[in-house]
């Protein structure tokens, strides 16, 4: 994919899937502004990796649930690179637990980051994208948002909400040349899944027709396609990258 002359804002871009997305966009020539929640060194490492690919990149700490911090992130991207053409909402957290024992804080934290965060960033870039009559917004949902998962009522609600928000905003912005799509990863080999006991990892495989975990790069390639000019006639869609789990 060719992203020469394009600027992308990627939330949660320092590690895992977010890092892979930053590198994939940088590989195509995009300027990358990534935000991170707390791991500054990981963010700087990702910036350096993007620059090694020949791209311009920068990182900024941002709590995506805070309106002023999101505005500062987008303003920084506009000031440094002149425009924002692509937004990838990847920032997300989990606070798993069964409904009967889940604390209200665990619900609020997940919805604030995963759902409100995507709302705030989309709102922050919508005006500039509409004005330039070009934009690509890609939101990271999850197969859990499609099918639910015991012990993840908060995470499932947030990711299902992302899908509904994606489809609604796609209808609002389509006439202005702005597409809004979602990618729903399945079980991807990241730090989060690596922390699972081997027995739990082994139990996952029978639920995946492809019989393996996905790679972060495979999610990134799907995101890059939806962020590209080749996907100009695709909007309001959810692309599952899950080895067939959603069949």
Task: Label each residue range with its predicted role.
Residues 30-45:
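Conserved glycine-rich Rossmann-like NAD(P)H-binding loop of the short-chain dehydrogenase/reductase
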Residues 122, 158, 166:
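Active-site helix of classical SDR
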Residues 142:
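Residue(s) in the substrate-gating loop at a strand-loop-helix junction
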Residues 98-99, 103-111, 204:
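Substrate-binding pocket helix/loop in short-chain dehydrogenase/reductase
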């Amino acid at each position: 994919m060719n992203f020469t002359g394009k600027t992308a804002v990627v939330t949660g871009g320092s590690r895992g899937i977010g890092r892979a997305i930053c590198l994939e966009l940088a590989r195509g020539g995009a300027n990358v502004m990534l935000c991170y929640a707390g791991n500054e060194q990981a963010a700087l490492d990702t910036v350096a990796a993007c620059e090694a690919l020949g791209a311009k990149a920068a990182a900024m700490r941002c709590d995506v649930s805070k309106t002023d911090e999101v505005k500062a992130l987008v303003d920084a991207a506009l000031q440094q690179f002149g425009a924002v053409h692509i937004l990838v909402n990847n920032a997300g957290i989990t606070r798993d637990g069964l409904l009967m024992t889940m604390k209200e804080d665990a619900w609020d934290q997940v919805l604030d980051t995963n759902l409100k965060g995507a709302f705030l960033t989309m709102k922050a870039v919508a005006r500039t994208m509409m004005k330039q009559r070009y934009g690509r917004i890609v939101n990271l949902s999850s197969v859990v948002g499609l099918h639910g998962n015991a012990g993840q009522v908060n995470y499932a609600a947030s990711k299902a909400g992302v899908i509904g928000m994606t489809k609604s905003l796609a209808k609002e912005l389509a006439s202005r040349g702005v597409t809004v799509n979602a990618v729903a990863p399945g079980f991807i080999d990241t730090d989060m899944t690596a922390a699972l006991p081997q027995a739990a990892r082994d139990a996952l495989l029978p639920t995946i027709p492809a019989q393996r975990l996905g790679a972060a790069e495979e999610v990134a390639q799907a995101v890059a396609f939806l962020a590209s000019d080749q996907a100009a006639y695709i909007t309001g869609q959810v692309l599952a990258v899950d080895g067939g789990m959603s069949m």
